[in-house]
């Protein structure tokens, strides 16, 4: 999605890595650790996302986000944005800091997500507690659930659209049409790879964890 936006004339900040993530990321990572202090772990796979919805956002958090986004916020480009996966961990306060921007919620089948590694695989790296496990796929699945629960608890912003990776790959023209109507400007057509779809059928991905089932059904994925 980031590459599509960049090729469509959206300034995505600078510099970017090969995945289209805005660099350097350290300020965003530190911001994630700050918001985690105010999300109590209830035990099991439950967290209390209530406090961060209404509390005053710490000045330190705002400073970190503004510093991370300095090239985006300071750009005169008519269309601006950014992408880095860890934004999701900060979503409640990002939504409140930037209530009028247009959000694109990029969703992927969690069974495919957990076949590969991500920086958020171990939530403890960002100060988030969860049941300890040596099973790397279970850790990844817990991280996916946490992030999905966090977004659901926070609710949609004023302007938001959900796009499933699978739909974008298999029905690119249809999904680009939805996005063009939502964003209000034409989007570039770039080649997309189909191999990320159904990866859990070809690579080790652990079991189908029961705690993922409700969210998979919510997003329209087969069980």
Protein language model features and the residues they cover:
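PAPS/PAP-binding and catalytic site of the sulfotransferase fold
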Residues: 1-10, 94-98, 162-187
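Short catalytic/ligand-binding loop motif for oxyanion handling, primarily in non-cytosolic enzymes
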Residues: 2, 21, 88-91, 111-116, ...
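Soluble or luminal CAZymes and related metallo-dependent hydrolases
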Residues: 56-64, 83-86, 136-147, 171
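Surface-exposed cleft-lining segments at the edges of enzyme active sites
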Residues: 75-80, 120-140
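Conserved phosphate-donor/acceptor-positioning beta-strand/loop module used by diverse small-molecule
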Residues: 83-86, 94-119
